[in-house]
Every structure is written in C-alpha cells, then in structure tokens.
Amino acid sequence: MSDVTYPAELEIVPLAKAPAAPVTVPGSKSITNRALVLAALSSRAKECTLTGALRSEDTEVMVDGLKRLGYTVRADWPRVTVGNTGPRLVPHAEADLFVANSGTTMRFLTALCAAGKGRFRLDGVPRMRERPIEDLLGALRSCGVGASSETGNGCPPVLIETDGLIGPGATIRGDTSSQFVSALLMVAPWNECPSRDFGIKLDGPLVSEPYVRMTEQMMLRWGATWRYAADQRVYTFDAESCASYFGPDDYAIEPDASAASYFWAAAAITGGRVTVSGLNRNSLQGDVRFVDVLAQMGCRVGECESGITVHGGKLHGVDADMNDISDTVMTLGAVACFADGPTTIRNVAHIRHKETDRIAALAAELRKLGAEVEERADGLTITPGPLSGCAVDTYNDHRMAMSLALVGLKVPGVVIRNPGCVAKTYPEFWRDLERLG
C-alpha cells in the first residue's frame, strides 16, 4: 500500500489568498481498475502496459486480486504491466480474494471469476458486507454460473462456482450500481454460450450512465465488438465479439475527474482560479461535467490545451440532477454552503449504498458546520447559513473527507477526523490541497 502516513485528525488551514495555480491530479481510479481487468482478459495474447495508473487502496486491492487469480502483474507505479502465461482465461481454478472496501474490485472480479472455471470466494471489510450485490449475482446465475451470497442476504462474501458463462445471457438492473452492468459487459465477449449469441438486457433506469459509456469506449479500444438494440436495450455478443479482444500494447490513463472536482470547487469557494491539467471535455469520465454545474452557479469555466480552468465568482444556488455525476454530490454540497441561496441535489438515491449512506452523512456533517439541510430519499436541499468550524466525521469515506475539507479553505477550525480514508483513491490529497496556498 501507499507509504503516506496520516494523523488521527487534521485541521484545515484557511487559504490566506485565493489560489491561482495549475493542479495535477493522479490517474483515474475508474479507468485504472477497468484497464486492469481488460488487460487481464486480453493477456493470453500479449502483455499490456498501463501508464498513468493510480496507486491507491482501491487499485492495489485490484492488483492483488489479479495476482491471486494467477495473472502476472508488475506494478512500478504509475506504470503497471499485466500478463497471463497460461492457457486459461482465469489462470487459477480456485482463489480467496479480499477486496477491502473497493466496490469496483468486488463487482469486476466477481464477474471475472464467473468467466473462469473453478471455485472462488470474494470478501471485504464490514461495510462491504453491507453493500448489495444480488442483482449481479442473479444475472450471473442466468449465465449458468453458481453465484451466491455466503450469508444469504444478497451482500458479500460472494461464492462463485463456475464452468464459464455458458448460459444465453442475462437481464441486469442498473438502478443500484452501474458497475454491475460494466462488470458483465467486460466479460461478455468471453462467453461460452453454445449458440454464441449471448445477450445482456438492461432493466429499468441506469444510474451513473457515463460510467457505462466509459466501459464501452474502453472495450472498443481493446477490440471487443457487439450489437446493441436501443429499442430493446439489449447488447448481443457473438462468436466474433472476442476475436480481436487483444487490446493495445500500452494504454494511457487520464487524470481523475472526480479528484479534479475538489480543486475546481476550491476555486469556486475562494473566488480563485484553478486549472486541472490533462483533462478536457472529451474525457472518458462524465465527472468533467461537474464544471457545468459550477458554471450554472456563477463560475467561469475555460478549456485550453493544458486542461480545464475554473474561475470563482459570486455563487448562486442551483437545482441539479446529479445522477450522471453522483461521485461529485459531496463536492457540490460543500460549494452549496457558500451560495446566495438554496441548492437542491436530486436523483441520487443510489449513493446511499456507497462507502457510507452519503445522503445522510453529508446532511449530518453540513448541519454541524451551520448549513440548513433538508434530506430526501433521493437527495437533499442545502440552504447556506452562518458557518463555523468544528470537527467533522468522515464515515471512513474518502469523498466525505475531501469534500468537507473544502469548507475549511474559508472557515477556520474545520477538523477532519480520520483523514487517512483518502488513501482509498487519492493518498496524496492533503499534500496537494495544501499546495493551493
């Protein structure tokens, strides 16, 4: 794991002046973990080297999981090479995997194990054992896989007993987590359905849709093919789908747009100017659209060859459907505290099933700081009030910690409890935040 050490509590020092600086954030966690899985799936053909890969708890448990499944992974961060010296799609026929609190690793490796042959068990920290995965397990059972929750409650630990994806396909709900859909899509080209006409049908609303689009774009880069019937919402994979699923020799990973949101928000809150390098509007990551919300609030947003810049301005409250960019809900919550009126965040009920119940947690902590918060099933409304510093809880949630810290850039006395939880996706966050000053 990363060698960064953290105190039990960290007081945020308000900025003496508005920042005017470029910022470089690490590689995208979402892209890194997808690329690791895609590289593993294509590694019987050749090795794939990822550049710009994020080193964090989430990506390190993914690397550990792939190694335990028998893949060769050489991690010289931010450069990672993945290979497979054996003839099997999943080299080992048995493995016990521990994914800590990494949702992407749990969902993606559950599907990867299902595409192999053998018996596998996947487990995580206590919070992971509370996060639902039954929708994915049910879909895998439709694919002919023995997939179950060890305790019978629809949450990890997960047990997989499989001879491959031999069923005709599955229907998968997307209203709990888009990662269930992405997990199935990445392994679908390797199905062993006798008819070689393997279908994945989407059922109901799809949350965080840009992450599925990210998965599709990355699969295309790896050479996968499929047909999609939009009227029926069905992906079909046939005998040709994995014929060229060999991937690139090298794959460059974008900076993390979710991480960038904290620095764009810092510009908004302080009236400063921050450019996050290496990102543009054509990013694979939907979270770059967080700057559009900031623009609606009164910020000025610019794009140049080096990155995307946010200039802070007088902030207005907004009414925002954040379903597509729900990882930035907490960031917006912090910015909303400095607006001239209420901000309503809608259509994000699914974030109650993240590292913590993010709606309830955000409401509780912003109230401590002085904001008025109305909590609803699918979101919340934040009305600014007189803010004062206090110790805030992070619920062991990296995004809660990074978002609440933004309030401390203007309000003295904000203390972050358990600041080390940022190691999940951004181990160097506190160093980079301090550099804004």
Label the predicted regions.
Residues 1-437:
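Short, structured segments at the rim of ligand-binding sites
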